[in-house]
């Protein structure tokens, strides 16, 4: 009897300790923060019972904000229409504070990632995306870049051509392999026989100076290209080098290609122009376009400008740029691969169009 009483007392003493480990369940335990509904709309959800306001920001349709309502269980819900298929960055804004989705399975460096539809990840042989660090001679610092190598590269004896693919303003070298889905897009194109094997280098075009375009172009020539050619089994002549960039990266593309036409055969300028706010004639003269037009026309196998349709914020500037370059004797092609404005939906479509044309 005495032993039974001691055991009962021990069980009673343990109850408060057990209660500390057994928290009350909440709707957040099983919450799915994003759901694609049968009609194509996306439902955003976040558990924030004490919040006063919730919104969502990111690569979402402009002019049609997602409106959230709070349920009695503390879950805020909002419907987004018009996304289409693809990969999108988003963040919740809770009481004015931007927060990443704590339940997102994929995240970029500064935002969560949502995949609508099948996305780009398919059952095909996949290449590798590696982070590499190099020393920049002109910037005098260690810098990072990403490199995509095709499936089977490790066993390949032959040398491959190289595409240098540059992001836009406000992003970095993680953007193309992240929200740009570059690795997956390239995997699929190669598996479908739509492009030749190549290496794709995604450098960091962001430099903390007032005008980062010229120093980045110098970094490309003096450090990035030599680093790649010293560390990868690549062809090292202009016929097997391509450069492409979006928005700010498009300005960097023109800066390096127009100043060094002897280094590249393929040049793609995506949603970009000569420096905004500057006289196009003066910028073209600074880049010696008229002086070198004959050399570039003969040396470039492709010079292509693209836009995301009239809603692309670079649309008018690009029109002015093309008019000036044409006046200065430079030949180029122009296309609109997607009517998605100044967005990653446009630039992913550009990459899907661009890559199959290279090194043929």
Model-derived features with residue positions:
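Non-catalytic cap/lid and distal C-terminal segments of serine-dependent acyl enzymes
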Residues: 20-26, 30-65, 70-360
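Sec-dependent N-terminal signal peptides
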Residues: 6-11
């Amino acid at each position: 009897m005495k032993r039974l009483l001691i055991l009962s007392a021990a069980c009673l003493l343990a109850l408060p300790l057990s209660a500390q480990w057994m928290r009350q369940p909440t709707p957040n335990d099983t919450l799915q923060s994003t759901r694609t509904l049968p009609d194509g709309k996306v439902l955003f959800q976040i558990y924030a019972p004490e919040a006063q306001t919730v919104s969502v920001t990111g690569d979402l349709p402009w002019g049609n904000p997602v409106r959230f309502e709070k349920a009695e269980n503390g879950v805020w819900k909002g419907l987004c229409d018009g996304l289409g298929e693809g990969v999108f960055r988003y963040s919740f804004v809770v009481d004015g504070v931007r927060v990443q989705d704590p339940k997102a399975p994929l995240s970029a460096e500064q935002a969560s990632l949502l995949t609508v539809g099948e996305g780009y990840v398919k059952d095909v042989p996949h290449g590798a995306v590696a982070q590499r660090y190099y020393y920049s001679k002109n910037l005098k610092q260690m810098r990072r870049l990403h490199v995509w190598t095709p499936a089977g590269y490790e066993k390949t004896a032959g040398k491959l051509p190289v595409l240098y693919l540059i992001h836009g303003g406000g992003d970095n070298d993680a953007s193309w392999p992240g929200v740009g889905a570059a690795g997956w897009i390239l995997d699929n194109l190669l598996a479908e026989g739509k492009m030749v094997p190549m290496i794709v280098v995604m450098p960091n075009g962001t430099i903390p100076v007032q005008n980062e375009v010229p120093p980045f172009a110098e970094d490309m020539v003096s450090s990035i290209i030599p680093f790649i050619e010293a560390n990868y089994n690549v062809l090292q002549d202009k016929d097997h080098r391509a450069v492409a960039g979006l928005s700010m990266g498009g300005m960097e593309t023109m800066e390096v290609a127009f100043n060094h036409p002897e280094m590249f055969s393929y040049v793609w300028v995506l949603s970009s122009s000569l420096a905004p706010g500057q006289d196009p004639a003066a910028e073209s003269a600074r880049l010696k376009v008229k002086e070198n037009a004959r050399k570039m026309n003969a040396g470039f196998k492709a010079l292509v400008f693209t836009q995301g349709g009239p809603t692309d914020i670079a649309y008018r500037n690009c029109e002015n740029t093309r008019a000036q370059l044409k006046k200065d004797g430079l030949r180029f092609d122009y296309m609109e691969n997607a009517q998605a404005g100044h967005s990653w939906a446009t630039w992913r479509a550009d990459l899907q169009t661009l890559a199959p044309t290279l090194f043929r």
